[in-house]
Amino acid sequence: MTFLKISLTLLAVFYISISTGFARDFASMDPALTAAKLQGSGRLTWWGFHIYDASFYRSGNLSSSEFALDMRYHKSFTGISIANRSAEEMKRIGVSDIQAALWGRELASFLPDVESGQTLTAIYVPKQGTTFYYEGKRIALIPGADFSKAFFGIWFDPKTSAPKLRAELLGQSCPPPLFNEAC
């Protein structure tokens, strides 16, 4: 019986340390996300390679407009390659070549190189835009709903190149109001 109690206690401590280790403190990044809750998470793989794990957080209730997308990378990438891929994905969902190239250059101007285990987080707040964080530190703000819709559309637009990841992130819920998509 004592062995069972010790085992259960160790298991509980392990579970708590794991779950709090992956929790994000969005309130310290943006006060609009004080009550952010995980809505869904998933893994992006490409040709069998684990690229990153993504987690989608919503503020308060599901009709709230504020949200965050947190990505923990499992491969190393240059900031320029992340920016270029983002621009390509924006074109895939219908952004013009010219606009995607402009936004790609803007992303390339601040996105850092990432190593395995590091995080990039993007937070959307209406009338403010998208704020980017690297390892929890603010690195840039791109104002405007047009950019935000294009950037987050990489994951949430129905034409995404990663429909399985989209479904995992959204869970049983609708996309954020930014997308005006009927459920």
Whereabouts are the PLM-identified features?
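Positively charged n-region of N-terminal signal peptides that target proteins for export
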Residues: 1-6
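Bacterial N-terminal signal peptides
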Residues: 7-17
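Terminal leader/tail segments of proteins
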Residues: 22-134, 138-183
